Amino acid sequence: MADMSVKQLADLVRTTPERLLEQLKEAGVAITHVDQTISDEEKRKLLLHLKTSHSTETDKKRSKIVLKRKKLSVVKSGKKSVNVEIRSKRTYTKPVVEQKRETEPAPTQEVPPTSDTTNLNEKAEVNVATLEKAVEAEVKEEAKKTPSEKKETPKKGPRKETRRSRKPDKEDKWEREELHMTKLVEERRRRHKPAHMPDSDSASAKLEQGFARPTAPVVREVALPESITVADLAQKMSVKAAEVIKAMMKLGAMVTINQRIDQETAAIVVEEMGHKPKLIKEDVLEENLVATLGEQTGEAVPRAPVVTIMGHVDHGKTSLLDYIRRTKVTSTEAGGITQHIGAYHVETELGMITFLDTPGHEAFTAMRARGAKCTDIVVLVVAADDGVMPQTVEAIQHARAAKVPVVVAVNKIDKPEADPERIKTELSTHDVLPEEWGGDTMFQPISAKTGEGIDALLERILLQAEVLELKAVDNGPARGMVVESRLDRGRGPVATVLVTSGELHLGDILLVGREYGRVRAMIGDDGRPCESAGPSMPVEVLGLSGTSVAGEEAIVVPDERKAREIARFRQGKYREVRLAKKQTAHLERIFDRMGEGKQNTLNIVLKADVQGSLEALTEALNKLSTDEVKVNIIASGVGGITESDVNLAIASDAVVIGFNVRADAPTRVLVEREGVDLRYYSIIYDLIDEVKKALSGLLAPEFEEKIVGLAEVRDVFRSSKIGAIAGCMVVEGVVRRHLPIRVLRDNVVIYEGQLESLRRYKEDVAEVRQGTECGIGVKNYNDVKVGDQIEVYEKTQVHRTIA
């Protein structure tokens, strides 16, 4: 604290400089003038003097009151009696209040230089006043008590005396806090208090709770995991679960208190109820692992480019790869079309290139997207005689989404009807411009049959790779992507992994999505086992715990325990999210099904050879569902058809479909014995067409009405047996017996029924043709009048198909 003058200090403590000089003199501080400065040491000396003088004056003003009490009582136990005498002594200090002098014009308020002295004075005054009140109340209580009231049982006497002896301590504790009460409230409370409770209202007032009901709604920030139950969501918002259920009913969703909802639905509910959602991810363990493995030490070296061949079906993608590899891969594909991704590492005269061959069928959209995700260059194959097709446009969109350069290969130029210039024009409408037109896309005419232009295509691919400057670290823990996975009967789960960085060795712990395992064997694209694989190398890995999802990232983990922990965590999270989405979809359709009739369902057990084909088939079959019929895939998997699949089909009345897989001998015996519908397919076209036919058979029959003839009523006769007989003239078509009819009056249908009798000249006939008179009897209808028209029609069933 900086030094200040006596005058400044007097202004600060709000007293006169003369009074402050007197106090300084009494404290022994040698200051005689108001303009002299006072140091911190002199201030502390003054404060100590004021505290000492104040306590001395207070002690002089106090006097002591000693209260003695003696109680006699008798305790009887049977014939004996014991006299009990209880003595108590209590001492109180009573302050003497001095009268203020009238001679002083105005009282001066002495304020010590620090806040410590002020608090000490206030606490001393409160303590003295409280003790004075306690003494007065105790004296009044002693005067009011009668001898009969003083007699107490010996058991209660000491207990009450002990309580009363503790009261001054309690009051002292309460007096440590300041009391904020108006005088009116204090007087009103004192009037209703009994006399034996001395000044307890001040103590109870200090113990009052300070809670006040909020006037404005409380807005909370609610942390939402990827799935949460309705009860937990209500607890996070501090509301009842019934309110959350009510809010979701307003949004059109029926939920229960223990039902799980996904993160997006929970965020909408939180916003609807006036709070702020905060989306959190429960994958901290995964992020930490990726962060630790993300720092790969080592120098980046050039690597081979990963080239994905895309295009429409039957445009020659696999044939182009055949010519480059000098093999016949197309002959191994059913129907000559690619139905899964093939990864091949090709060593050409110009350099190393890794090729990915993707399917062109529309059902394999997800597989093409995966191919574009892990590639460096996309070779777009377009047939010169066919032009740009839907899957060609889709491949362009995948390449743009992945921000990958495109090299266009115009195939089949050896055909007479080939027109490469038309291909350039059609691709230019999709913003794919050749270099000679001022664009940045390289075009190369080729023929996968004769080999024309293929060397030039490889040169363009490697030129594009040099421009991209592709590099990767070739040592350390490996990272890659699962291109395809399948379940081999003899070797177990097999995953085709494309290494992107690092080096994969035998014995490494590999973590792939929800699966993990030790690499027991690695097989190259040429079918030979290998010890290690570097960047841009595709290998088949054996040893995983299950068939992994294609497109997942593969990471080498140093610890098997950590890999197992992360895999189980991912499995639990995937199960919760899938269950939440399934329940949400089920509840969204509940109201739609209430007003509709029974929906016919075709249950299917689907088995495929690889994971990618299974995904494509599942998506394609689910798209066939309509409002009337539905495809329900109750089970799907990778690998051969087993007895458990057949038993599941028996229990659910399902059709077993195998795509490029077969059933073993015991399973075939079970199929024949139980009569299960088992079908094998190797081409996706045939599978989808057969399922369409099966769904068409489940459609409700549709009937079409065809007007056969029209007769005009000329006269009406009455018959005792039949009733009214209409004499008619057939004016159009043929009138046949036992066909449904309509009676029209003024071109308005007034009755629909059955033609009961048809006569001509009193003879029953089967039909009457145009221009012939006849008598017609309508079943259960006698109100036929002249001028009416009788329309005869028949219903024919129309064959319905799935579009």
Curated annotation (Swiss-Prot):
Region (G1): 311-318
Annotated localization: Cytoplasm
Protein's name in the database: Translation initiation factor IF-2
One annotated GO biological process: translational initiation
HAMAP family: IF_2_B (MF_00100_B)
Gene coding for it: infB
G3: region residues: 357-360
PANTHER family on file: TR-TYPE G DOMAIN-CONTAINING PROTEIN (PTHR43381:SF5), TRANSLATION INITIATION FACTOR IF-2-RELATED (PTHR43381)
Assigned keywords, A-Z: Cytoplasm, GTP-binding, Initiation factor, Nucleotide-binding, Protein biosynthesis
Pfam families with a match to the protein in the record: EF-G_D2 (PF22042), GTP_EFTU (PF00009), IF-2 (PF11987), IF2_N (PF04760)
Domain of life: Bacteria
Compositionally biased residues, Basic and acidic residues: 138-155, 168-188
Skewed-composition ranges (Basic residues): 156-167
Primary location group: cytoplasm
